Curated annotation (Swiss-Prot):
Keywords: ATP-binding, Ligase, Nucleotide-binding, Protein biosynthesis. This is Glutamyl-tRNA(Gln) amidotransferase subunit A. GO terms for molecular function: ATP binding; glutaminyl-tRNA synthase (glutamine-hydrolyzing) activity. PROSITE patterns: AMIDASES.
């Protein structure tokens, strides 16, 4: 199994952009190499949809723009999109049989903005069905395998994105994060990934799971690469009702407000130019309890020690409702999912049962056949907690708890620390099938990421070591910031990556 494409010979996105500008390599060469690598690594099952003609057409357009001097900041950079973003030309399934064969007539805003910047898409990436899962085992099209150890899960729900980046099939990928679905697979696959502040990246064209939680974010080898993508992806979008006006900028010719290379870059520059001496790193005691595996704890502690050597100060903090984030999330997210997924009934689009008697039977059969077990489970939970007899007892209580969780974070940032650091996941990647008989075990894997999502804060995962019995399963460090603090998070990650090489390590070839 070939694990890397031509782009790896040039380094990160900035170096690759320079190589393209100097004509040391062409966008077509990069695209063809990526397509070849993706085919050779098909055993990972990271890609769901590849169309070489579409990819090479984009690459030729990028080469033409480079020759004409009109290239965007990502011209020719090979990327791929999680199959939760609708894409004109490529099928979009959200990892579900329900949407098998669906072709969107438009691009998601994230896809559109990256295309406008010149990025070349190699295709659509596998994911847990409707982004519901922590191991990418819930896809209707089979599980994704972790490039570091193909017996292991890559994490989820953006497992295809993390696996493709880790295997160096693409320079970067898009993902979505509802309860940890960018950060957790990034950690388990040894790549960098960031969930921005809720509302800073448009959700338009992103297939909805939990609308008050869903947020798009990029995955790439390094924090500098993440900054390159995030500066293109962020910005106010009037087509998304949850898009924040705080991200506005100049309107383009179409009238759509866009933000360019500003807030995240400014925060990155400001934080990157300052010494770390005196930076207060909050370390939650609840993140280092009995549930944290020793190998993960050791890697995270070593990363914290590295920051201390750089001048930062470690400060103990408390997030007392950390474990309560699990029940709060698994009330709120399923409630929103049950509403969002009600549209898939086989009438307008989506899977339609072949045999049925009347309209009601057609809808019930179509949904029974089209949805997988985990999606059905969450729809049932969501319907239950929204029912008349239980709405107050479950849903409203969960929303109250959500507010208290957000207040815990704000109290820590206001009085005690500048950023918060800890593990992303309590363990390294499990083997595929380990939790097949206990589906709720995957829910517990997000204990350190759910509170951040409920609060709407930005957070990222940075590779910080390895664990597992053979020492080859990656561990991620989670860096959490206050609202709109993405630039600082990326700058801190970059300072760490300047003195460590975890993000530069790639898995050796192995048969999948």
């Amino acid at each position: 199994m070939t694990q890397s494409a031509l782009h790896t010979e040039f380094g990160g996105i900035a170096a690759l952009r320079d190589a393209l500008a100097r004509r040391q390599v062409s966008a077509v060469e990069l695209a063809q190499s990526g397509l070849d690598a993706a085919q050779a690594a098909s055993g990972l099952n990271a890609f769901l949809h590849i169309d070489p003609e579409l990819t090479l057409a984009q690459a030729r357009a990028a080469d033409a723009a480079l020759a004409a001097g009109t290239a965007g900041p990502l011209a020719g950079i090979p990327i791929a999109h999680k199959d939760a973003f609708v894409t004109r030309g490529w099928r979009t399934t959200a990892g579900s049989k329900m949407l098998a064969g669906y072709a969107s007539p438009f691009d998601a805003t994230v896809v559109e903005r990256l295309a406008e910047a010149g990025a070349v898409s190699l295709g659509k990436l596998n994911c847990d069905e409707f982004a519901m899962g922590s191991g990418n085992e819930n896809s209707a099209y089979g599980p994704v395998r972790n490039p570091w150890d193909t017996r292991a899960v890559p994490g989820g729900s953006s497992g295809g994105s993390a696996a493709a980046v880790a295997a160096r099939l693409v320079a970067a990928a898009t993902g979505t994060d509802t309860g940890g679905s960018v950060r957790q697979p990034a950690a388990l696959c040894g790549v960098s990934g960031i969930k921005p502040t809720y509302g800073t990246v448009s959700r338009y064209g992103m297939i909805a799971f939990g609308s008050s939680l869903d947020q798009a974010g990029p995955l790439a080898p390094s924090s500098r690469d993440l900054l390159e993508l995030l500066d293109v992806m962020t910005g106010f979008d009037p087509r998304d009702a949850t898009s924040l006006q705080a991200c506005d900028g100049q309107a383009n010719e179409s009238g759509r407000v866009r933000r360019g290379h500003d807030a995240a870059q400014a925060g990155y520059d400001a934080a990157g130019s300052q010494p770390l001496k005196g930076l207060r790193i909050g370390v939650p005691q609840e993140y280092f309890g009995a549930g944290l595996a020793p190998d993960v704890a050791a890697a995270v502690e070593a990363a914290l020690a590295q920051f201390e050597q750089l001048g930062a100060v470690r400060v103990p903090v408390s997030l007392p409702r950390t474990e309560l984030a699990i029940p709060a999330y698994y009330v709120i997210a399923p409630a929103e999912a049950s509403s969002n997924l009600a549209r898939y009934d086989g009438v307008r689009y989506g899977h339609r049962a072949a045999q049925y008697g009347d309209l009601n039977e057609m809808i019930s059969r179509s949904r029974a056949e089209g949805f997988g077990d985990e999606v059905k489970r969450r729809i049932l939970i969501g319907t239950y907690v929204l029912s008349h007899g239980y709405y107050d007892a479950y849903y409203l209580q969960a929303q109250r708890l959500r507010r208290l969780i957000a207040q815990d974070f704000q109290r820590a940032f206001a009085d005690q620390c500048d950023v918060i650091m800890g593990p992303v996941s309590p363990t390294v990647a499990k083997n595929i099938g380990d939790n097949r008989d206990d589906p709720t075990a995957d829910w517990l894997a997000d204990v350190y990421t759910l509170g951040v999502s409920l609060a709407g804060l930005p957070a990222m995962s940075v590779p910080c070591g390895f664990g597992g019995q053979d020492g080859r399963r990656p561990v991620g460090l989670q860096i959490i910031g206050n609202y709109f603090d993405e630039g600082r998070l990326l700058a801190l990650a970059d300072r760490y990556q300047q003195v460590t090489d975890w993000h530069q390590r790639a898995p050796v070839s192995q048969d999948a």
